[in-house]
Swiss-Prot record:
Active site: K75
Reaction equation(s) it catalyzes: shikimate + NADP(+) = 3-dehydroshikimate + NADPH + H(+)
Name of the top EC class for this enzyme: oxidoreductase
Name of this protein: Shikimate dehydrogenase (NADP(+))
Function: Involved in the biosynthesis of the chorismate, which leads to the biosynthesis of aromatic amino acids. Catalyzes the reversible NADPH linked reduction of 3-dehydroshikimate (DHSA) to yield shikimate (SA).
Family label: Belongs to the shikimate dehydrogenase family.
Gene that encodes the chain: aroE
Classification via Pfam families: SDH_C, Shikimate_DH, Shikimate_dh_N
Keywords, comma-separated and alphabetical: Amino-acid biosynthesis, Aromatic amino acid biosynthesis, NADP, Oxidoreductase
Amino acid sequence: MRDSRETFVNHAFVAGYPVKHSRSPLIHGYWLKRFGIQGSYRAHEVTSDAFPDFMRQIKEGTAGFCGGNVTIPHKEAAFRLSDRPDELSAELGAANTLWLENGTIRATNTDGRGFVANLDERAKGWDRISAAVILGAGGASRAVIQAIRDRGVKAIHVVNRTPERARELADRFGSAVHAHSMAALPEVLSGAGLFVNTTSLGMDGEPAPAIDFSKLARDAVVTDIVYVPLKTPLLRQAEEQGFRVVDGLGMLLHQAAPGFEKWFGLRPVVDEALREIIISDMDKHA
């Protein structure tokens, strides 16, 4: 039996600028079809100037949405403009998933959940580590740091060209996080069980600097939040050096699942068929 929200839960969105490149409509479209839901999920290009009005329309119901996703450059604005952000988004200062509840806009951030779910699927046992190295201190690194800290990783070393930005993250996320300059990379790699690239290095096939991963723990995992190309230069380097690697596509797929459940009432599964649909689309637009 459908609940009384049926007329509202049928239409969701992803809003960003630009947003034409988004693969979220493919992901949610796959799940809608699989469950036989008569709903929609569409991309909407919304400029920064227009975003507050877009949020107002969502709250008032004039936009016809039950909720949706927000992507660059609106994640911080979505957090600020929502009525009830949760603790995850509050610590990050950014939200990527919105839903209407009793006339209010609620908000969360599912990026970190997507990141660890990808590792859980592709590198079982990864969280038995004691130390991790995060390359980059931009917005993308926040959710990764939060998620692995909350999974119990005791030492998280953030390495960045501008160490001041890494120190800001250490101040935000507590004593488990340590800030370093790039010069410290060889030292902090020693014995670490997880290496995460959160920078744009290697995106779209661009070259990446050579990294000697040999000081990592023998069973360490190297992962990249970049998923175009699927196997980035950093992942190729790590694989050639004998380490387990996990591409970034699974993070994109898994972060989408909590929102779908909020809007449409069913928990979707990230399966190989969905993964192949997205890879096929990536190949088509390569």
